[in-house]
Swiss-Prot record:
Gene: psb30
Record-given protein name: Photosystem II reaction center protein Psb30
Keyword Thylakoid attached: yes
Keyword rRNA processing: no
Topology relative to the membrane: Single-pass membrane protein
Lineage: Eukaryota, Rhodophyta, Florideophyceae, Rhodymeniophycidae, Gracilariales
Job of this protein: A core subunit of photosystem II (PSII), probably helps stabilize the reaction center.
UniProt cross-references to Pfam families, sorted A to Z: PSII_Ycf12
Amino acid sequence: MINWQVIGQLTSLAMIVLVGPAVIVVLSLRKGDL
């Protein structure tokens, strides 16, 4: 049995962990350009 709820939570958590730092870097670079 595959627990899709757990997989969904892990996927969303991984997306937040991976996308979070990228967004911060992009914002800092844009502020640096301005």
